[in-house]
Amino acid sequence: MSKPLIVITGASSGFGAEIAKLFNADGFPMLLLGRRTDKIKALPLDFTNVLVESVDVTDKTSFENAITKAEEKYGKTDLLVNNAGVMLLGNVLNQDPAEWKQMMDTNVLGVLNGMQIVLPQMVERQGGTVINMSSLAGKKTFTNHAAYVASKFGVHGLSETIREEVSGKNVRISLVAPGAAETELLTHVTDESALNDYNLWKESMGGTTLAPERVAQTVKFIYDMPQTVNIREIDIAATNQ
């Protein structure tokens, strides 16, 4: 029996790349989305049943077109991993409001776009899973993270609300909230002071953060549960955080 389609956003690096490796190793057809398709195509994957599309999740039309293209080839999406995200550190007193908007658009509206695209068919066939990547910053505050924290609290709130709305149709909505991890999220930070504060905080924990592979294993664990079991949320962090 052929395996169903897995869609992963933000698949070029970090959590998304590691999630793609796990599902690829298990033989799932995949749609991998990201703005840096060259990096996705350079991943150590068997691309026989993998589509790679350049998509900005804030552009709902291109997002939907990519999913439609994949579903025409592999069937309906059974798992959407909303992994694309932006973290731009800064103090609200002086951070560029354009950075607030970028985080809200990607981290919140991008997630909603993906869910609105795939949920109608999941509800109709009474099956399917959406796993939203949030953060421990969706549960507690961190200095110089005000807008990012707001966006991730939003992901927590929308995930639980939509879970309540679709759970009666046997559709699972789950959430993974990682702590500090070794990804490329910090490469776009423009506030050097905020970045230095973050690095000092990381050093205070011994400099050890979460490996993206562990987050990928968590996503796979959630998905591999029977459809009648929904692990609503997993918070995961390095032991010393």
Predicted regions and their residues:
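Residue(s) in the substrate-gating loop at a strand-loop-helix junction
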Residues: 135
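The beta1-alpha1 cofactor-binding region of Rossmann-like NAD(H)/NADP(H)-dependent oxidoreductases
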Residues: 54-65, 97
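C-terminal helical subdomain
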Residues: 175-176, 195-241
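Active-site helix of classical SDR
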Residues: 115, 151
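Conserved glycine-rich cofactor-binding loop
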Residues: 12-13
